[in-house]
């Protein structure tokens, strides 16, 4: 157990370090790795939404999937399976993304924002924890999306093939792929493809080996008083914060800024930061893992996680096509309505799939 905890802490430190370094090499501030934002950008790059500021096929997405695939194959853990309420998972993924884009980041970016000095993310953490507690309430009463079934290797490999196709499209850059113009928004800020892909391959490999998951830390602490994953989260924040502070002192860049106001790609509306991550946390508990974990599981051959990723992508497209996503100016009225609807829908799904009412 002690060795496992050391491995998880080391993994968290490496991930935090790499995420901060990716910002140095060009990724948006406090966004070295953000699954929600990167899926949103990729959806834009494929033309699924028309928000020109956030259009770029992020190689980190492919890297996480392929890194997890490599780890699973090397350690005999590639196990294609699926068939556990896929449409329900799609809907949960959709609304988890709506919650993330209300907050402006997935649970992992929440940690990176804290490491960059953004105190709004600590406010969001309150909502995230509350959402996890809401999910645990139903888990303790028999919530289940029922069993999975063994699938073929071809089925389990589909998401990995898609990851390779996305890389080809990024490098080939055909005319039908969209890219944010320089200076046009977060989509224009990115590290070199090789740097992004290399870092993500490492993160994908490590997270597959350690089962690193933003949901598991709090969930397992509440259910089993298990703390090893929580220490992994602390390691992410500590490593990213230390790297940010060093980079700021050496380069003079704005890698660390303590406060609420004028934080990069963030807003200061506390209520909707809380509610956005409440929705994301609640939905992800019901899904069995955070967005990063879903990417890793899809690399292992889990088609249910692949369907969840499709829900994330469609949610991102809806968020930007219909004005649901927040901006630095704050949440939109449409987004607020969508989050309230999402909380109601996720609660209904939790209740209807709980069998010891």
For every predicted segment, state its role.
Residues 1-357:
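Membrane-interfacial helix-loop segments of redox and metal-homeostasis proteins
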């Amino acid at each position: 157990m002690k060795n496992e905890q050391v491995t998880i802490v080391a993994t968290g430190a490496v991930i935090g370090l790499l995420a901060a370094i990716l910002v140095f090499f060009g990724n948006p501030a406090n966004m070295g790795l953000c699954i929600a934002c990167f899926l949103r950008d990729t959806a834009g790059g494929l033309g699924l939404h028309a928000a020109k500021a956030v259009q770029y096929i992020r190689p980190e997405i492919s890297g996480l999937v392929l890194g997890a695939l490599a780890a699973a194959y090397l350690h005999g853990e590639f196990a294609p399976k699926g068939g556990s309420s896929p449409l329900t998972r799609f809907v949960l993924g959709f609304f988890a993304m709506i919650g993330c884009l209300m907050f402006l980041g997935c649970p992992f970016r929440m940690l990176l924002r804290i490491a960059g000095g953004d105190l709004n993310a600590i406010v969001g953490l309150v909502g995230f924890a509350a959402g996890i507690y809401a999910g645990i309430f139903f888990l303790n009463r028999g919530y289940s999306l029922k069993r999975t079934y063994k699938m073929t290797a071809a089925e389990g490999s589909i998401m990995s093939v898609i990851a390779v196709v996305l890389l080809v499209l990024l490098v080939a850059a055909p005319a039908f792929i969209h890219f944010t113009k320089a200076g046009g928004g977060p989509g224009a800020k990115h590290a070199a493809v090789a740097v992004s892909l290399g870092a993500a391959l490492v993160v994908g490999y490590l997270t597959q080996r350690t089962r690193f998951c933003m949901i598991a830390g709090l969930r397992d602490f509440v259910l089993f008083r298990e703390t090893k994953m929580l220490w992994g989260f602390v390691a992410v924040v500590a490593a990213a914060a230390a790297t940010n502070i060093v980079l700021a002192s050496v380069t003079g860049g704005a890698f660390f800024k303590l406060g609420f106001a004028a934080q990069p790609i963030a807003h200061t509306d506390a209520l909707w930061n809380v509610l956005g991550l409440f929705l994301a946390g609640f939905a992800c508990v019901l899904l069995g893992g955070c967005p990063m974990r879903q990417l890793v599981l899809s690399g292992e051959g889990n088609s249910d996680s692949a369907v969840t990723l499709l829900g994330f992508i469609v949610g991102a497209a809806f968020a930007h096509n219909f004005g649901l996503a927040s901006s630095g100016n704050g949440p939109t009225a449409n987004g607020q309505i969508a989050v309230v609807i999402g909380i109601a829908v996720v609660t209904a799904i939790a209740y209807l799939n709980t069998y010891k009412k």
